[in-house]
Amino acid sequence: MYYIGVDLGTSSVKLILMEPTGDIVNTVSKTYPISFPKPGWSEQNPTDWYDKTCEGIKELIKDIDKDKVAGISFGGQMHGLVILDENDNVIRPAILWNDGRTTKECDYLNNEIGKDKLTEYTANIAFAGFTAPKLLWVKNNEPDNFKKIAKIMLPKDYIAYRLTGVHCTDVSDASGMLLLDVKKRDWSEEMINICKISRKQLPASYESYEKVGCITKEAAMELGLPDNVCVAAGAGDNAAAAVGTGTVGDGMCNISLGTSGTIFISSSNFSVDNNNALHSFDHADGYYHLMGCMLSAASCNGWWMDNILKDTDYKEAQSHITKDMLGNNHIYFLPYLMGERSPHNDPLARATFTGMTMDSTRTDMTQAVLEGVAFAIRDSFEIARSLGINITETKMCGGGAKSELWCTIMANVLGIKVHLLKSEEGPSMGAAMLAMVAAGEYENVKQAADSIVGICRTIEPEKDIADRYNSRYNTFKDIYPALKGVFEKM
């Protein structure tokens, strides 16, 4: 049998065709436009998502026996607002996760409703990217559109609706709406009232691995598939990626070292960071997770190499950093090129080099960039540990994970094992695995992950290096507070 995983990204949809063994049969990617109608705004047409997903599915399955396709599921960009009228037509373009128009609405929620109340109701506070502030923006600025709303949906769930006719979402994606009581895994009545909506306007919520239905006869005819293809609810992109990397079960962790950085920590217990440095969301495996977000991760090294050194040979630049140099560098780098989310929630934070002398070299500064990102990731780890979560190992993926040196630095800064993966298909692979569970191929998400996800290499910390980094991390922690007031004046 075959399973389709759909990763609905911001610029493209990526699809994967997998067998239950984890073997990848085919992959396809289709792009679609994004519009910026005003500075800070970011929108897309939901019908573009569906059209390109259908194109991709047809191409994905063209060379196989279509009757052997057993399931499909989704991972997708989170937080986007899709609103439908009573005839299920899209009312206006979707407002995306990276849209920044909701400053006033976030101020209202965080200051007038109050961060403590929001945390009580949803386990999170308001950020510009979240869905509830967007909903309030429509209410305040497009009242006619607000009155037309019959259903409030998220991006990937619009695709599921078009394929099944079911208005649904999953708890991992819904966690990022600021409308879900994360602990109870159900809609928050308080937030429903605050946003002046009704429960019937919200989709039915499922666990990520649950079957929401089968594709309709119309969708089956359009795609050339049988109409008994099982559709699973799917997950938000980070939770789907966590499934795809095997980050399921208590205390499991995944670090995604891409342009931005994500620290994803799975836990069987619900916990909230009262300082709001980490998000508390539901996980796709039925557990919970804490998530830290760095706005600049591998992009720090890209900036350093491309903009400053004007050098594209990343491997050569890092080859001069020897093992005995690890933990002995005198330069510190704050990796806040675009401000920072976790743990500071400070858009005014800036990147800095600190500690240069006449003896400092290009290699020292290259090393400092790699170490600065690792120290910033440790900030999120320390918060999770303070909440009683014991992290002993992590998966690592993304472009930065291709650097063996960076992975070695990470293992020693964090003091834990770092596992590198055989496959990095991420959200699409996780989505396909969720479809397998929904179709009965596996009993649960952990069983699927244990059977499919492979580790190609493990890097372990070395005590002497880890001890040196512990000392340096304590100094790193002092730099941002010392400069915060300076950043505010810039």
Features from the language model and the residues they span:
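N-terminal glycine/serine-rich phosphate-binding loop of ATP-dependent small-molecule kinases
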Residues: 1-92, 120, 148, 220-221, ...
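Generic detector of well-ordered alpha-helical packing
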Residues: 8, 20, 46, 86, ...
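Short beta-strand-loop/turn "lid" adjacent to the catalytic site in phosphate-handling enzymes
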Residues: 58-97, 125-131, 160-181, 204-207, ...
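Short, acidic/small-residue loops that bind anionic groups at enzyme active sites
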Residues: 92-106, 421-422
